[in-house]
């Protein structure tokens, strides 16, 4: 079970807002990640076929890359790799814009974190139901 992961007690807090004055970053735990630059595409207006975001360490670490996935239809509650050798995976719940991240640190330790990514969708240009979405803060 995901919740039995050893890292749950040390779950990493996330910050989805870019304006830290109105929403301070929590620095509890071993790692702090900032999620920004969320984007996605809904070709039929109801599901994503592409989404991504930037993830950056805010604790002095070197983590700073774009995590993304593409498919004919990205499924809610399914884990997607952030990329080769990243040791990070994500799952997205489109109905609540919820992001779940996990980072495999070792065979015994997995860090887990969650956040909500508010976003705005507009016409995408590839038909009446095509939408392009981007994060808002």
From Swiss-Prot:
Leader sequence residues: 1-11
Q: Which domain of life is it from?
A: Eukaryota
**Which residues form each disulfide bond in the chain?**
67-82, 121-133
Keyword flag Zinc: no
Q: PROSITE patterns recorded for this chain?
A: AA1 (PS51895)
The cross-references to CDD domains, in alphabetical order and at most eight, read: Alt_A1
Which InterPro entries has this protein been placed in?
AltA1
Which one Pfam family would you cite for this protein?
Answer: AltA1
Keyword match Signal: yes
What is the first-listed, main subcellular location in coarse terms? secreted
Which residues does the UniProt record annotate as the domain AA1-like? 28-137
Could you tell me the keywords of this UniProt record? Allergen, Disulfide bond, Secreted, Signal
Quote the record's miscellaneous comment: On the 2D-gel the determined pI of this protein is: 4.0, its MW is: 18 kDa.
Subunit field text: Homodimer; disulfide-linked.
**Under what name is this protein listed?**
Allergen Ulo b 1
